[in-house]
């Protein structure tokens, strides 16, 4: 997550209390061309999962940004991101950030080799 933050991407964590937050959703609205892209499924967004080291099931949707499904998915995501309607789902990156060098280098090794537990 630190790589994303350092690249200027906003990151929030699911605010869990013993349970796991397991869903994966990538939503991209591309500026300028009015397109919406979403990847939903079981794959973690890591080399191990995206380079076919694990059997995963995902679906990719490419829609006009003003399509009803794109609007609905964006509303759903924004509700989780912004804790809307009195429901609490996420917290800022700083709440769970852990940038210890040992963790960073373990992550780098696991990503480079495709050997990981995530």
List PLM regions with ranges.
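PLD/PLD-like phosphodiesterase catalytic module centered on the HKD motif
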Residues: 1-118
């Amino acid at each position: 997550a630190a790589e994303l933050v350092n690249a200027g991407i906003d990151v929030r964590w699911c605010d869990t209390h013993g349970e796991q937050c397991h869903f994966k959703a990538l939503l991209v609205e591309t500026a300028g061309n009015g397109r919406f892209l979403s990847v939903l499924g079981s794959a973690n967004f890591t080399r191990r999962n995206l380079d076919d080291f694990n059997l995963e099931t995902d679906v990719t949707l490419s829609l006009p940004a003003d399509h009803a499904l794109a609007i609905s998915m964006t509303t759903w995501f924004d509700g989780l991101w912004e804790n809307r309607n009195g429901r609490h789902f996420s917290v800022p990156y700083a709440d769970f950030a852990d940038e210890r060098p040992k963790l960073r280098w373990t992550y780098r090794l696991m990503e480079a080799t495709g050997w990981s537990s995530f």
